[in-house]
């Protein structure tokens, strides 16, 4: 004799079991696809940021007006407006032009001009451009540092160009929202088609 609540446990029909299995499989596939798409987009955004800052740093370092301004008694007077125009046009968060000792000639915050650059410069001082992720006065950023060469091919200044991590994250946040909407739609279609 069986003692219990008197309720009998119902078994799911084969059709219901298959439906649940299909929903789980579709859910797992949609989640995996959305996750892979997001990770791929994050890598692409980082690559794009590095390519952008590298190109802008090289362009600024090679600009004839930068060399001319560096030869004046007051480089910041000419370099600051130029750097700010390029920064706005290129869509980067900062362009810092500095002397080889790291003293800033330009900065998005004019109060920081004349202060020390925060970051690595050794590779650029050796004549090679490089990229890094560094936390400076504007927070964490993906940045490139490029040498400015004088007439005798000696390093006479450095250019650092960066995009803040928060700007990259904002781009990814928008993408994530779009991915969630698409994933939900695909999941709904997958469930409806089951």
For every predicted segment, state its role:
Residues 1-11:
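Non-catalytic regulatory/interaction regions at protein termini and inter-domain linkers
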Residues 9-101:
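Juxtamembrane segments flanking the first transmembrane helix
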Residues 53-56, 91-93, 139, 144, ...:
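Envelope-exposed proteins and targeting segments
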Residues 76, 160-180:
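Helix-start (N-cap) segments at beta->loop->alpha junctions
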Residues 94-96, 132, 146:
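Generic short beta-strand
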Residues 103, 107-139:
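Extracytoplasmic/periplasmic sensor domains and loops in membrane signaling proteins
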Residues 142-169:
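Short, hydrophobic beta-strand elements of compact beta-sandwich sensory domains
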Residues 173-194:
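Cytoplasm-proximal transmembrane signaling helix
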């Amino acid at each position: 004799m069986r003692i219990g609540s008197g309720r009998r446990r119902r078994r799911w029909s084969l059709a219901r079991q298959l439906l649940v299995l299909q929903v789980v499989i579709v859910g797992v596939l949609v989640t995996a696809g959305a996750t892979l798409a997001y990770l791929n987009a994050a890598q692409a955004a980082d690559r794009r940021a590095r390519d952008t800052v590298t190109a802008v740093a090289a362009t600024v370092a090679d600009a004839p007006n930068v060399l001319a301004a560096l030869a004046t008694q007051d480089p910041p007077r000419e370099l600051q407006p130029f750097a700010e125009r390029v920064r706005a046009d290129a869509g980067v968060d900062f362009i810092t032009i500095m002397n080889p000792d790291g003293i800033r000639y330009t900065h998005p915050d004019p109060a920081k001009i004349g202060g020390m650059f925060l970051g690595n410069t050794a590779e650029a001082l050796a004549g090679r451009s490089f990229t890094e992720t560094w936390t400076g006065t504007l927070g964490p950023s993906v940045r490139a540092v490029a040498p400015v060469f004088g007439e005798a091919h000696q390093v006479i200044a450095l250019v650092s160009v960066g995009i803040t991590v928060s700007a990259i994250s904002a781009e990814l946040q928008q993408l994530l929202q779009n991915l969630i909407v698409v994933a939900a739609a695909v999941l709904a279609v997958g469930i409806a088609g089951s």
